[in-house]
């Protein structure tokens, strides 16, 4: 789909909650799901993903894909959804934007390799709109069972590349956000080595992790869109080489 960013705010109505930009975001996460699943199935070499389409009664649906009992992955789940409907009453004052309807699409994944030398990972990337207001969220983190510093450096370098291309402020802020988001207060420790995390990222405002704030200066909607796409595409580069390196480590 060709995107006309000058008309990005079209839609967002009860008749068309997604608009062209929402449909483009959905197409983007579907393509990303294909890319990630193809890469993981190639690395595994034995098992394949089983697809389970589903529908949401209130509007929308998705497709879940699961690979089980593979040669490399014990289980890998990669799911995409696109849902819409009325903004719940409890969210009307807490959710950005205005208007009675919302649209949300995204991809979410959790991967568990068999070999403890290969790390578990989690990632998600999402686009949400309410009326004319649209924002992005997402992130990826890595949980090694056996820590290899070179793997940690590779993972962070791959995730930092799209951040640095968009703004020098992004990576340090999103890395710190991830560290705080996945901090286990009860155990007084972080979950794995972190990664990046961001939410409610929109042009002309600020983002906050509840502790610190960052102004989103000089970046219009198109720039943030390109960052979001690049951040999602960076996941395969960040994770797959690590699994290829560690899947046969004894």
Residue ranges and their predicted role:
Residues 2-20:
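Short, charged, low-complexity amphipathic alpha-helix
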Residues 17-96, 212-250:
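Gly/Pro-rich turn-and-neighbor structural signature
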Residues 20-21, 46, 65, 72, ...:
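Alpha-helical protein-protein interaction elements
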Residues 25-28, 32, 36, 40, ...:
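Generic hydrophobic secondary-structure signal
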Residues 47, 52, 65, 101, ...:
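Flexible, active-site-adjacent loop/turn segments at secondary-structure boundaries
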Residues 49, 56, 100, 127-131, ...:
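Solvent-exposed, non-transmembrane amphipathic alpha-helical segments
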Residues 64-138:
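Internal mixed beta-strand/loop scaffold within catalytic domains of large alpha/beta enzymes
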Residues 134-249:
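Long, contiguous internal "core" modules enriched in hydrophobic/ aromatic residues
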